[in-house]
Amino acid sequence: LLKLPVEKEFLIGGIMFEVGEVAVYPGHGVGRIESIEEREFSGTKQAFYVMRILDTDMTIMVPVDGSKNSGLRSVINSNEVKKVYEILKEKNVAHDNAPWNRRYKEYMEKIKSGSIFEVAMVLRELYSLKVWKELSFGEKKMFEIARNLIKKELSIALTKDENEVEEEIEEIFTKNYKE
């Protein structure tokens, strides 16, 4: 196991990640790049980002060469934050009467896409569904996953406390679904 010098950076899809930076890994959320390591597999050396997911403390190794394909990306900027809030504020969400297993599959695909906008749509749809009927165990779990992914990334993007961001999200939904 070789550790590469900290000053060595890698360009990925126009984005350079350095040790200490935060990035988003699809389906897992925000993590910190702890190191860039080189490992040898079948005689070929390959560089990896070693990333610790902030919420779960899980460590993920992402091949530097394949990180763009894996969906590794920077935390969103202020314009993208506005777009997330716009998605959450959308009203008149159509309720999909598809069986739960089909909705679950669609929601998981959106969550694993790495797009915070897709995750915001999942959160909005599940909140809307929650107003309409009691969520099943699986739906509640999916709701929590989506909410936590959104809350963590927005709190870092806005440099706000997670509880404050959660309150803002709850306020949006409360206004949208007043009875």
Task: List where the protein language model places each region.
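Charge/polar-rich, low-complexity and marginally structured segments
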Residues: D65-E179
